[in-house]
Amino acid sequence: MRLKRFLLRYFPPGIILEYEKGGELKTKAIDLLELSPTTDVDLVVEEIQKAEPLITASRTQQVKQLILRLQEKIGQQDSRQFYLFKVLRAHILPLTNVAFNKSGSSFITGSYDRTCKVWDTASGEELHTLEGHRNVVYAIQFNNPYGDKIATGSFDKTCKLWSAETGKCYHTFRGHTAEIVCLAFNPQSTLIATGSMDTTAKLWDIQSGEEALTLSGHAAEIISLSFNTTGDRLITGSFDHTVSVWEIPSGRRIHTLIGHRGEISSAQFNWDCSLIATASMDKSCKLWDSLNGKCVATLTGHEDEVLDVTFDSTGQLVATASADGTARVYSASSRKCLAKLEGHEGEISKICFNAQGNRILTASSDKTSRLWNPHTGECLQVLKGHTDEIFSCAFNYEGNTIITGSKDNTCRIWR
């Protein structure tokens, strides 16, 4: 084994080793999820060298410099205010979802008008209209980090795969017997998972365009699904009050997470795949040990349905959004509520962190989106201007651009 080079990963902090083994180029990641501006760097370097034979004494200084760079990035204070850059009269009918590519150079909007549109973020110009679905385009995603493909899931029961560069349709995946409402690419960008109102999830092979697996076992609609960071697990959240954990590529169901007393609205893995967070209409969020499928915490406090849940990029914070008009931030390790985000005058349907983990963005039926400090719960900015409910919002990876999608048929770019 021979170390070729180091690559830095800012969020979540880590160093990627590129090395040669038996003539093949391979990579492995050293996660530094606990790194903070006050961490003793020499100690971290020492621990890395003990654990990683590829990093020899001659590389010590280099590794130290990399960690100092990560530390500097984490410590950067962000007092940015966002301003409205463009209003895109995106579709003739309401939007369903918005999503960025990894670099944030382009984003996509899905709509009830049966299309998905690709936009250039810098100019606000429309690049492509992806046409071909025969009903609402509901679930949309880029194959990040690559960003060269787009998947669309529709109420017409099909999923389509498109070229992000040309807008050409590569495949139409047929097999579901009801609406597709959620989808995800695996991290390797070799599979697409789709979740449907027909109670099943399906996996599709991107290369061949064939169905690879059907995951059956839920007793009601699948409303949420996501892969873990390595792509060997998939979770599906259902209206049957449960979440299933599936082994990929075998399709074996490893665990059924039972305990919620209402429909699941969202289910997510944390970065190191040790925890699963689930949000439910029973007003609670639960944390589960992903290895044994046991519930390790029930995060309470909301007075109405929990509509969304998300981890920050390191997996140390959990944020929930509720129909009670508040959001909450919990510590994943202590399970305590760290901050209550109060100020919206309507339900919050969407919540997300920026990649840096120092900002939270919420979308609400009160026609505003808000920016928050996750540690103090302080509202830093209210993004006003939409004339109807905002149900989708996203940060780009750099954290310097925001998109919001509303029932007013427009999409707004803020930066």
Swiss-Prot record:
WD repeats: 90-129, 132-174, 175-214, 217-256, 259-298, 301-340, 343-384, 386-415
A GO cellular-component term linked to this record: motile cilium
Keyword rRNA-binding: no
One Pfam family this sequence matches: WD40
Keyword Flavoprotein: no
Disulfide topology: none
Subcellular location, record wording: Cytoplasm, Cytoskeleton, Flagellum basal body; Cytoplasm, Cytoskeleton, Flagellum axoneme
CDD domains documented for this protein: WD40
GO terms under biological process: intraciliary transport; outer dynein arm assembly
Coarse class of the protein's main subcellular location: cytoplasm
InterPro entries recorded: G-protein_beta_WD-40_rep (IPR020472), WD40/YVTN_repeat-like_dom_sf (IPR015943), WD40_repeat_CS (IPR019775), WD40_repeat_dom_sf (IPR036322), WD40_rpt (IPR001680)
UniProt keyword terms in alphabetical order: Cell projection, Cilium, Cytoplasm, Cytoskeleton, Flagellum, Repeat, WD repeat
Family from the record: Belongs to the WD repeat WDR69 family.
Function text: Required for axonemal dynein assembly and ciliary motility in ciliated organs, including Kupffer's vesicle, during embryogenesis. Facilitates the onset of robust cilia motility during development.
UniProt protein name: Dynein assembly factor with WD repeat domains 1
Record organism: Xenopus tropicalis (Western clawed frog)
